Amino acid sequence: MRDATPFYEATGHEIEVFERAWRHGLPVLLKGPTGCGKTRFVQYMARRLELPLYSVACHDDLGAADLLGRHLIGADGTWWQDGPLTRAVREGGICYLDEVVEARQDTTVAIHPLADDRRELYLERTGETLQAPPSFMLVVSYNPGYQNLLKGLKPSTRQRFVALRFDYPAAQQEARILVGESGCAETLAQRLVQLGQALRRLEQHDLEEVASTRLLIFAARLIGDGMDPREACRVALAEPLSDDPATVAALMDIVDLHVA
């Protein structure tokens, strides 16, 4: 049974750019804040293009071997197991490296030959050199807000990609996303969007992160399930945004102005 196409509300020309990049064998870089729809966009495009998707959530301990594969030992001896990047190349699918700057530096070395005209993947441990088929696509993402001197994409890496900038949607679009993702009433969606915009204005004051579209969707789903709106906004918005009780209380004052 085919999986349903994920809901996605386009905010610009990102679908057209992605499709053109795929047709020409160009890798794509997605940059934008947490919870603004980067991962959902890749899921949507994989289904739209009818391609297998291999998603990897990058972290500090993720190295090239985790992407390429490794030899395993079992009762029947030693065998090679492909990693997600290798499987995507073999199958001609999409490999999505989410928050790629979090991974170790050797991962960058591994993807460079795939992100230029060579479109090759070298498996040093098996001696194979895989030529990516035309349908293969490499997609990476990162949050520019987390950039620092120790963790960031080098210019030599960024310039191998077509880049798409994502941000939180305009109010009307974000309301449609909330309705589409949660099934909530349009009036509730509009109030939650207004709340989200009010919370985002606090970014430069008390919060390290702002209220993402993802968190607004969580709140809409909980309210739609019958939870008290104020409590839903507390657990889905205020508490995830801060551990400081005074800050949470201040956020709840803003919630009371928009939802309760």
Swiss-Prot record:
Keyword set includes Phosphoprotein: no
Leader sequence residues: none
Induction profile: Under denitrifying conditions.
InterPro entries the UniProt entry points to: ATPase_dyneun-rel_AAA, CbbQ/NirQ/NorQ/GpvN, CbbQ_C, P-loop_NTPase
Location(s), subcellular: Cytoplasm
Keyword entries, A-Z: Activator, ATP-binding, Cytoplasm, DNA-binding, Nucleotide-binding, Transcription, Transcription regulation
Family from the record: Belongs to the CbbQ/NirQ/NorQ/GpvN family.
Designated name of the protein: Denitrification regulatory protein NirQ
Species for this entry: Pseudomonas aeruginosa (strain ATCC 15692 / DSM 22644 / CIP 104116 / JCM 14847 / LMG 12228 / 1C / PRS 101 / PAO1)
Encoding gene (name): nirQ
